[in-house]
Amino acid sequence: MQLDNILSQLFENQALTKAESQYFFEQVIQGNVSNEQLAGALIALKVRGETIEEIAGAVEAAFANATTFPTPDYDFADIVGTGGDGQNTINISTASAIVAATLGYKVAKHGSRSVSSKTGASDVLSALGINVAISPQTARQALDENNLCFLFAPLYHAGFKHAVPVRQTLKTRTLFNILGPLVNPAHAKRQLLGVYSPEVLKIYAETVRTLNHQHSIVVYGSGLDEVAVHGETLVAEIEDDKIHYFSLIPEDFGVQRHSIEALRGGEPTENAEKITVLLQGKGEAAHIDAVAVNTAMLMRTFGERNLKANVQRVKDLLRTDKAYQTLQKLAQYQ
C-alpha cells in the first residue's frame, strides 16, 4: 500500500476501505505523514464525511499501536464525548463518572487535554488534584478498589501526538474527535458516547456496532455532546448487535428544564470549583440535573433501564458529600 495513492484517493473524493484507512492512520501514528499531508487528508475526510469503514480502520490502527491496559473481566463502562460541540460547558461526563463510581458502577474514563474547547477532562481533573498520568497498573488498581480510573489518552495513544499540531492549527472538528471516545485502551464494551452533531450519531452507532460492544448508547443533546437538560436528546442504543433510535426530553428523566447558559463553564480552575461544590452536595440545580440525567443514562448500560429511578438515586447521592470522597480517594493514586 502506498501513502501517495491513499492521499490521491482522498483528494479525488474516493472513500478508503477499512484496510486502507488502518494503513493510513498507522502511518500517522508512526510519524510518517507530514503535517501538510495530514491536514489535507483530515479536511478531505471531513468535507466528504467519514465512512464507517474509515472510522473503524482508524480505530484498529489506534488499538494496534496503543499501550496495553490490563482489562478486567468484570463489567465496567466509559462515559465520554467527542468534544467539539463549542458550548464550553462544565465537564458533565467527568462529574458523572465520579458519581456513577460512588453508586457502585465501575468506570474507566478515557480522555485528554482540550484541543478544541476550553477545558478537557484531564484539564479539569488536574485542577482537582488528580494525577492523570499514572501507570496502567496503578489505574487498574484504582478501578478495582475505588470503581474509577482515568485513562489519559496521550499515555496510551502516544502516536496521536503527531496529529496535535495539525489539530490545533485547523481549530475544527476532525476524525480525531470522532476517534477519541472509540479507542478506550481498557476496551470498554459499555459506553455512553456523546457526539457533536446529529449527522455523526448514526455513523457512530453503526461503527460501535461493528466494534462488538455489549451495551452502548450514543447521544446528541440539542447542541451538546451530552444528554440535554435544555431540550431534546437524540439517542442510539446499541445492544445485542441491534441499534434502537429514539429521543428523550428532560421530563422523561423527571427533571425540569434548564438553559444551556446555566451549564457554562470556563477555565479548568473554574470548572473544578463548580464540580467540587457539586460533589460536596451543594451543587446548583442545573448542574445536579445535568449530571443526574447523564449518570442515569450511563447506569442504563449496566441494565438499569428506569431513567427516573436512576435520576433519583443520583439526586439523593448529591445531597451528601460521598461523591467528593470518591474524588479524594482517586487523588491518592499517584
Swiss-Prot record:
Its cofactor is Mg(2+). It holds the Pfam family Glycos_transf_3. It comes from the Bacteria. Anthranilate 2 binds at R167. Mg(2+) 1 binds at S93, E226. Its EC number is 2.4.2.18. Pathway: Amino-acid biosynthesis; L-tryptophan biosynthesis; L-tryptophan from chorismate: step 2/5. GO terms for molecular function: anthranilate phosphoribosyltransferase activity; magnesium ion binding. Mg(2+) 2 binds at D225, E226. One of its GO terms (biological process) is L-tryptophan biosynthetic process. Homodimer. This is Anthranilate phosphoribosyltransferase. It comes from Actinobacillus pleuropneumoniae serotype 5b (strain L20). The gene is trpD.
